[in-house]
From Swiss-Prot:
InterPro entries: AAA+_ATPase (IPR003593), ATP-dep_Clp_protease_ClpX (IPR050052), ATPase_AAA_core (IPR003959), Clp_ATPase_C (IPR019489), HslU (IPR004491), P-loop_NTPase (IPR027417)
Keywords: ATP-binding, Chaperone, Cytoplasm, Nucleotide-binding, Stress response
Protein name: ATP-dependent protease ATPase subunit HslU
Protein source organism: Petrotoga mobilis (strain DSM 10674 / SJ95)
GO biological process assignments: protein unfolding; proteolysis involved in protein catabolic process
Pfam families, alphabetized: AAA, AAA_2
Length: 469
């Protein structure tokens, strides 16, 4: 059983619990959807082709965890993931990006993911090649100019046999000296003794996109053609002077890429995008037509109709070849505060059979969000300030007070969910963050009194809190 087979729905939910508080139903549904994809891969070919993923529609107000659930799911499954906003697309024929661009982005993400894995596999070999290349720069071999023989050279051929053995001995001695010198420097290089030595290396010059500034759709096409032309043209190279420590970072990706099988990379990247890819479509409620059939709503419905074949399953042309969207998992999300899921066109509703409703966060949820997740908000600030020698301790009543203020602000001003916590915590720690670098090492206890001291004036003034918190 390999690593992906071990991802049972329960284990997926457990992993999601490390990052996301609450929303048990939504976690359960995405975990089942992921497991069904794993089950599908175990089926025979004739059955597998008929089993398509059941797409998910998440319904919940902003800041309750919709995006985070989808993003962490892709992370757990090590699957290619791309997030797009439905509002950025326009109907075919209008100025703007068309819906096929999301599939191209997914394939790019997938290929880059596979490339990163392959580069990690050849990392040791690439590092050795980089060291050899650096040593060759430090101790270059003798360059022998090969000019056309002159008349005098031809006349001297009679004496060449007599001189050949002497020249050969000289060349061999010189090559031996170069080899010995390189071995000495290689040992020093591996011991880190030469990191600050400056050398001159030859690197490929980065060229600007050929079709930039043409508008979203034409630019998308232009990038495909631009990369194709750049691959046909010889690469421009330039010489740069840098320290060996920097040269390692510049040369390692170049050497790693030479060791990678590009055909295998593209094949695996495309396959992973088609069979494991996840596309998260946010703000899908913003393209509902609400029963109106004129004005800007015509374009909104047009976007829905353009989305339909992508979600149903079609073939999209990309720079890596044709990509089938039949088995890509689509997760759509929206607050649906001013519209209902039933306002989507019926055909699109039918393509998102699983509905996951996310509940609004409570004060207790806020307390848990501040403290419980892996690298929770308060832990992040503690780590950041610790780098400047400041040790922060949050008391229980201090955490409760921040959660209480964030919850009340969501109730009275605008409900932005857990994002409100960042605003509150940032304001509480504003003075500390400003003073920390110049104050040396010190400790600070943040309790409810300190929170009120930092937020009292802003929180008490209705006009100020609307603009600042």
């Amino acid at each position: 059983m390999n690593k992906i087979d071990e991802l049972t729905p329960k284990k997926v939910v457990e992993k999601l619990d490390n990052y996301i508080i609450g929303q048990k139903e939504a976690k359960k549904q995405v975990a089942i959807a992921l497991r069904n994809r794993i089950r599908r891969l175990s089926l025979s070919e004739d059955v597998r082709k008929d089993v398509i993923p059941k797409n998910i529609l998440m319904i919940g107000s902003t800041g309750v965890g919709k995006t985070e659930i989808a993003r962490r799911l892709a992370e757990v499954a090590n699957a290619p993931f791309v997030k797009v906003e439905a509002t950025r697309f326009t109907e075919v024929g209008y100025v703007g990006k068309n819906v096929e661009s999301m599939v191209r982005e997914l394939v790019d993400s997938s290929v880059n993911m596979v490339k990163k894995e392959m580069m990690e596999e050849v990392k040791d070999k690439a590092q050795r090649l980089v060291e050899e290349r650096i040593v060759e720069v430090l101790v270059p071999s003798k360059k022998r100019a090969k000019a056309q023989p002159s008349f005098m050279d031809v006349m001297q051929l009679f004496n060449q046999n007599a001189e050949y053995s002497q020249n050969k001995d000289y060349d061999e001695n010189e090559d031996e000296n170069i080899r010995r010198r390189r071995e000495e420097l290689l040992e020093k290089l591996r011991n880190g003794e030469l990191e600050d030595v400056e050398i001159e290396v030859e690197v490929e010059e980065q060229s600007s996109p050929m079709f930039a500034g043409l508008g979203p759709e034409l630019e998308d096409m232009g990038i495909q053609f631009g990369e194709m032309f750049q691959n046909l043209m010889p690469k421009k190279k330039k010489r740069r002077r840098m320290k060996i420590s920097e040269a390692r970072k510049v040369l390692e990706p170049i050497e790693s890429e030479k060791l990678i099988d590009q055909d295998k990379l593209i094949q695996e990247g495309v396959s992973r995008a088609e069979n494991s890819g996840i596309i998260f479509i946010d703000e899908i409620d913003k393209i509902t037509s609400k029963g109106v059939s004129s004005g800007p709503d015509v374009s909104r419905e047009g976007v829905q109709r353009d989305l339909l074949p992508i979600v149903e399953g079609t073939t999209v042309m990309t720079k890596y070849g044709s990509i089938s969207t039949d088995y890509i998992l689509f997760i759509a999300a929206g607050a649906f505060s001013e519209a209902k899921p039933s306002d989507l066109i019926p055909e699109l509703q039918g393509r998102f059979p699983i509905r996951a409703e996310l509940s609004d966060l409570t004060k207790e949820d806020f307390i848990r969000i501040l403290t419980q997740p892996k690298n929770a908000i308060l832990k992040q600030y503690q780590y950041l300030l610790q780098t400047d020698g400041v040790k922060i301790e949050f008391t229980e009543d201090g955490v409760e007070r921040m959660a209480d203020i964030a919850f009340e602000l969501n109730e009275k001003v605008e409900n932005i969910g857990a994002r409100r916590l960042y605003t509150v915590v940032e304001k509480v720690l504003e003075e500390v963050s400003f003073e920390a670098p110049a104050s040396g090492e010190w400790e600070l206890k943040i309790d409810s009194n300190y929170v009120d001291l930092r937020l009292g004036k802003v929180y008490g003034d209705e006009d100020l809190r609307e603009y600042i918190l």
